[in-house]
Amino acid sequence: MTGQTPLLEAKNLQCERDDRILFENLSFSVHSGDVVQIEGPNGAGKTTLLKLLCGLAPLRQGELFWRGERMSQARPQFLSSLLYLGHKTGVKALLTPLENLRAWCAQREDVNEERMMSALETVGLAGYEYSPCNSLSAGQQRRAALARLHVSSAPLWVLDEAFTAIDKKGVAQLETLLREKANGGGAVILTTHHSLHLSGEVRRIQLGAVS
């Protein structure tokens, strides 16, 4: 990676909660082709770190850079290049999986109906495209959210516990998709309690070492 400008760079990040430092002086970079797993025990700040990176939590110490520019200047470009999938699915309960995906794409992606239907079929929701999400299981609702990955052209994916509530087939499918994203020049940052079985390298950042 020598000489290559990182997609995302973090310098000297710190997170404090209830007068306890979760992490400090945290610096790392994420390049095209990277899959980066954030590790640490519960309460170590993994979700908070993802939110800091995505601008969903206030950054009180440290700096972020997107493609070599300070995040304060590059925010619009960064947001248009980001897909964030949080621990909560963000799926609207009264909408169907197709309506949810259609609404999401309307704000971010130029995707036709055929491709949306294909994405829902790929994640195992064939036959449920028109069912309200509040009638679906937790795993099916998670799959409705994961369908976004199959239509996303964003170069950076940030995923918080994306493997939650999906079956073995869905896990294998998602692992393949993440590797394909990286191999295609994108990058993935994720947290998961699942043991990843991805071909190629997975970089790991360990939290929880600060007392």
Curated annotation (Swiss-Prot):
It catalyses: heme b(in) + ATP + H2O = heme b(out) + ADP + phosphate + H(+). GO terms for cellular component: plasma membrane. It is a peripheral membrane protein. It is found in: Cell inner membrane. One of its GO terms (biological process) is cytochrome complex assembly. Coiled coil: none annotated. Disulfide bonds: none annotated. One of its GO terms (molecular function) is ATP hydrolysis activity. InterPro entries: AAA+_ATPase (IPR003593), ABC_transporter-like_ATP-bd (IPR003439), ABC_transptr_haem_export_CcmA (IPR005895), P-loop_NTPase (IPR027417). Its EC number is 7.6.2.5. ATP binds at residues 40-47. Transmembrane segments: none annotated. Keywords: ATP-binding, Cell inner membrane, Cell membrane, Cytochrome c-type biogenesis, Membrane, Nucleotide-binding, Translocase, Transport. Residues 8-210 form the ABC transporter domain. It comes from the Bacteria. It is an enzyme of class 7 (translocase). Its main location: membrane. Part of the ABC transporter complex CcmAB involved in the biogenesis of c-type cytochromes; once thought to export heme, this seems not to be the case, but its exact role is uncertain. Responsible for energy coupling to the transport system. The complex is composed of two ATP-binding proteins (CcmA) and two transmembrane proteins (CcmB). Belongs to the ABC transporter superfamily. CcmA exporter (TC 3.A.1.107) family. NCBIfam families: ccmA, PRK13538.1. This is Cytochrome c biogenesis ATP-binding export protein CcmA. The lineage of its organism: Bacteria, Pseudomonadati, Pseudomonadota, Gammaproteobacteria, Oceanospirillales.
